[in-house]
Amino acid sequence: MAVEISQDYINLLNQAVSREIQVSIQYILQHAKMEKLIRKSIPENILLDKTTYDAVGKFLREFAIQEMKHAAAVMERIYYLGGEATTMSDKPNIGDSLSAFAKDGLKAEEEALTLYRKIIETAGKIGDWETRELFEKIYGEEEKHLFKFQEYANVEDETEGSPTVLVSEWRKIFTDDYYALLNKAVQAEISAIIQYTLQHEKASLLALRGKSTALEVITESNKPSVVSKMLKEIFLVEMEHLEKVSERIYLIDGEAVFNPDPIPQIGADADAFLKLDREAENTAIVLYKKIIAEALRLGDTKTRRTFEDIVIQEEEHYWRFDDYLR
């Protein structure tokens, strides 16, 4: 390594990783919460095909994916520099209204720009030009996010003047215990997103290393590169799962949590990734089948069908990981 890298420098870069994971989770959960807010706004917007909530929901989802890609890019750079990327996230702020989403987003982006200016300056001082260039690119994208949130920071939320609606009998099935069970799925999905993203970047670095067989030389590929590509595909699917589950929780008047459980496990090489990920999928499938059984018992058809669809995809993930371990 031509540049001398200190642990303090790696820690500084990991602050960016924690921040990017935080806002990615924050924006995807806010996007999921939009469906509930849209329903509240329908009486005031009955003649409109589109509301402010639709517009904000769209860019929140786009930002969530982009922020996770930022996290992945910084993770890859940390691994290349010989460090270990963190699995820890700063605490997301979700809020309960469009204006709160915008103000929390504005604050998060302002904090990001301050941190990234420091990283750009530090990288320049030690001659780490690649990291400086990476953060200059990310800085420009975060600045665009800031400007977008500024557009909505002073928007007026829908009034709460409508009369209180009594809870219908069928909605009384949604208890705190049921919300807690569904939130275990949220935690599992967040854990998988972080785990697979970190492994994708670590596998990408391993793929750059020497080829050991004639086939690898001819194909200019190796197992880590194949695993890296697969993990990228799967983590995007897990983002969709997180969105669907958290949206369902919000629609039945619950609150989604934002901490991963279990703690993401990374591993040292491609085989370790696959074993850890197969076990993560196994754990998720067992949990989701428990949720399906409980939803069936309660008569919660929408939740049951949502998780039945998710389980089909999780089983596909399980077998993809298993195929490479045989």
Residue ranges and their predicted role:
Residues 1-326:
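Iron-associated oxidoreductase/ferritin-like identity signal
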